[in-house]
Amino acid sequence: MSIRGVGGNGNSRIPSHNGDGSNRRSQNTKGNNKVEDRVCSLYSSRSNENRESPYAVVDVSSMIESTPTSGETTRASRGVFSRFQRGLVRVADKVRRAVQCAWSSVSTRRSSATRAAESGSSSRTARGASSGYREYSPSAARGLRLMFTDFWRTRVLRQTSPMAGVFGNLDVNEARLMAAYTSECADHLEANKLAGPDGVAAAREIAKRWEQRVRDLQDKGAARKLLNDPLGRRTPNYQSKNPGEYTVGNSMFYDGPQVANLQNVDTGFWLDMSNLSDVVLSREIQTGLRARATLEESMPMLENLEERFRRLQETCDAARTEIEESGWTRESASRMEGDEAQGPSRAQQAFQSFVNECNSIEFSFGSFGEHVRVLCARVSRGLAAAGEAIRRCFSCCKGSTHRYAPRDDLSPEGASLAETLARFADDMGIERGADGTYDIPLVDDWRRGVPSIEGEGSDSIYEIMMPIYEVMDMDLETRRSFAVQQGHYQDPRASDYDLPRASDYDLPRSPYPTPPLPPRYQLQNMDVEAGFREAVYASFVAGMYNYVVTQPQERIPNSQQVEGILRDMLTNGSQTFRDLMRRWNREVDRE
């Protein structure tokens, strides 16, 4: 009764699909029952073959001897703690050898020449029989030490973690943002002489602590990866491409820690518009206009869903009330069978209407979201094409940075593109001056496919959509408290930002007043990550809703309303979705 294929001698073959690691069957096996062999292999053995297997039961009490071994003094062996320590050393050595044997068992068989070459190199390097064992990386080894130290401090010695509180839940990316911000704060204090040497030194120390925290989190991540997949054979669930982006299957998602990087997410419509011809640009603009018109015409149908959801809820409540009043339960099934001749009761009618209403709302939310993505991508492509068309067909007026007039020396293709652009401007609501010029701010955002709402850029749009934009021009302690209160962290603006500013950090543009800071005990009990991601999700949904629907700012739904309507879409629905999908199918198929 032994585990074959995972033997302790390190020379066994790879276990096959039937659990037998060798071509010939063992002589000790009775019969040809593979199920019995597999059941027997679940139990550990005390034989020499399975003694170094990782599946063997580790008996610690048998390793702690009562008598001192050779080479040790009686005084050192007299204490219980010293004997227990020696037993732990033996357990650690046994686990190390078991890992080595498991590695040699799972690894593929190599030729005799390769093994001879490796044995020769191992004898020269004095590594012995562990030449086939892959050592830990320095980062993973340090992460294991850090994890063991944290476990010993928090669980054994009952000490608090050095990063306890709300900031202890930050991941590597968020800690890296905090390190970058604290270092920039220290530079800002020192450059503008806003603090003395002691204050600057304290800020530098905090920045160093955050940098050390980033390194610790990176090493712990490497250690967790090693523990979850020690052989490096498992395929990762996601492949990260850019910070904040991950792919699951064929779908790309964005869950980054930076609100300012939302416009940099590659959603599939990122085109180099400067390499396209005038005819292609004109076609992209027209396609974007058709997609935008389709979305605008679809909004009344989507708004009609609220009434259908309310009717479904009323039907459900009526059915529940009727059932409770009439006592229509499973116990009264016999009475109901006798009443079949008299017709269905009110409770049965209400329940049947509820079932019919539920059966009438069947739709595919996956295709619904896919069509929304395709149409929004076409709108963004048309916007980017319009930005490039402005560069080609319009010239900037003198004395103004955002007023454009059509050029006179245009080719026939360019003139056609200018006409398409004029229709695009009229449909977008861009006013034309008396002299025939257009007032178009921030054309660069158009060329990237980022919507420009009410003459404001993308950064300003996200600031307005946030309930309260945090103030960056504060001292360190107030800044940290305010960041916890807001539930997210905002990066300082880039140095190449195109709008002029009076300071290194922007003042809030939000119309809402700045609230007073809550007490410290409330700050320490707030959940940073949940509110942080909620703010990112709300700003993104509000941006898409405001751009597609072109409604006033006060009609932007908050995250709770958006989450509720999405949940209703997943669980409920109506014929409106089928009509909507039929219309969107016709629009998507048009090319």
Swiss-Prot record:
Residues 110-132 have a biased composition (Low complexity). Residues 1-10 have a biased composition (Gly residues). To C.muridarum TC_0268. Residues 11-32 have a biased composition (Polar residues). This is Uncharacterized protein CT_875. Residues 490-507 have a biased composition (Basic and acidic residues). Residues 1-37, 110-135, 324-344, 487-517 are annotated as: Disordered.
